[in-house]
Amino acid sequence: RTAVSSSDLKKVTGQKPSGAMRIKAGATDFDPDYYVNFEEIGTKHPIFRCWHISEDYFLLQLYKKGAEDMINGGTSADVSELAVFKAEDQTIMPVTGLPADGKFGGEPYGEKGYAYMAVTVTTGEKPAFYKIDAKTGKAVKGLTVEADAITTVGKMEYLSK
């Protein structure tokens, strides 16, 4: 499926399901023996976004109500579901431990087998960072921020000369 945008419209077109292909190290073409249809495994929901965590683990942000909501919902489609994809095993594991009304910041940060995601809730609580274990899919609440929302998370590192 392809997303098309204009200043007042965002709509998904096409019929292909969300999926993954790979290019093996040193190759220049897609591996013809590797294709994963995300809409046939895990929660069977299409992908909104995908980020590398570590090794062959990827954090997926999914359309929680499935393909129909993705196609008809436009910018109001529910994208509040996270899952971990393990590429070698071709498995998807839902992330647990997140608030039910969580909305996610733009970019997570991945390091040493964990993804760190900014989460804002609608219940009046302050936003917080959640640490997601790539191998278990378990999210644990970390630092709470005195703000209305958090848009992203990252790491700054001082490089000495």
Predicted regions and their residues:
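Short, solvent-exposed coil/turn segments at beta-strand boundaries
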Residues: 1, 24-27, 52-58, 107-115, ...
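Acidic, serine/threonine- and glycine-rich low-complexity intrinsically disordered segments
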Residues: 1-58, 62-65
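Short glycine/acidic-enriched loop and turn motifs that connect beta-strands
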Residues: 4-9, 64-70, 121-125, 160
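Beta-propeller blade signature
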Residues: 13-28, 75-89, 129-137
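Beta-propeller fold detector
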Residues: 30-41, 91-99, 140-146
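Repeated scaffold domains used in trafficking and secretory/extracellular systems
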Residues: 40-53, 100-110, 145-159
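C-terminal hydrophobic structural anchor segments
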Residues: 82-122
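TerminUS-proximal long segments
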Residues: 127-129, 133-161
